[in-house]
Amino acid sequence: MSGMNQVVATCWTCLLLSAFLCEPVLSKGGRGGSRGSSRGSHSRSPKAGGYRGGGPHNGGTRGSRYRGRSSPVRVASAAAAGAAVALTADKWYASAYRRSKADGSDEELDYYNRTNYFDAQMSSSTQNGSSLSQLVSIIIATFSPKYGLLMDSIL
């Protein structure tokens, strides 16, 4: 993996973590939202969302109130997922490229040796560890294959 891909992956990871940890909705308890208390009590305002009104006039206000708003966590998650898919596709492509070439040049073997660890991590049939430890191991190995192998031997 080139140094530029590592920088991009690091930036997206930091963006996702900061958006996830700093999201005010996630740290607020209950169903309160921005109005009312955080314990889920109903607001007394008639325009608060139509929780009590079951008639035809208030029927569509609850669902349409939240449409059109995009959370920073959703945006960051989508961006991080795109970056993860791109990095994973790069590793799978490198593995397939190495297997299709039979001339055995040193450059291709060296590139395959760096991606062989990721192939083993991505295959769930040979691993019995917890998914969290595998995720941590993959993240560490993405940024430094040397430390990833060390972490894999520890776990």
UniProtKB/Swiss-Prot annotation:
<feature type="glycosylation site" description="N-linked (GlcNAc...) asparagine">
    <location>
        <position position="113"/>
    </location>
</feature>
<dbReference type="InterPro" id="IPR029238">
    <property type="entry name" value="Shadoo"/>
</dbReference>
<dbReference type="GO" id="GO:0005886">
    <property type="term" value="C:plasma membrane"/>
</dbReference>
<feature type="compositionally biased region" description="Gly residues">
    <location>
        <begin position="50"/>
        <end position="62"/>
    </location>
</feature>
<dbReference type="GO" id="GO:0098552">
    <property type="term" value="C:side of membrane"/>
</dbReference>
<feature type="lipid moiety-binding region" description="GPI-anchor amidated serine">
    <location>
        <position position="125"/>
    </location>
</feature>
<keyword id="KW-0449">Lipoprotein</keyword>
<protein>
    <recommendedName>
        <fullName>Shadow of prion protein</fullName>
    </recommendedName>
</protein>
<comment type="similarity">
    <text>Belongs to the SPRN family.</text>
</comment>
<keyword id="KW-0732">Signal</keyword>
<feature type="propeptide" description="Removed in mature form">
    <location>
        <begin position="126"/>
        <end position="155"/>
    </location>
</feature>
<keyword id="KW-0034">Amyloid</keyword>
<feature type="signal peptide">
    <location>
        <begin position="1"/>
        <end position="27"/>
    </location>
</feature>
<keyword id="KW-0336">GPI-anchor</keyword>
<feature type="region of interest" description="Disordered">
    <location>
        <begin position="29"/>
        <end position="71"/>
    </location>
</feature>
<keyword id="KW-0640">Prion</keyword>
<feature type="glycosylation site" description="N-linked (GlcNAc...) asparagine">
    <location>
        <position position="128"/>
    </location>
</feature>
<keyword id="KW-1003">Cell membrane</keyword>
<comment type="function">
    <text>Prion-like protein that has PrP(C)-like neuroprotective activity.</text>
</comment>
<keyword id="KW-0325">Glycoprotein</keyword>
<keyword id="KW-0472">Membrane</keyword>
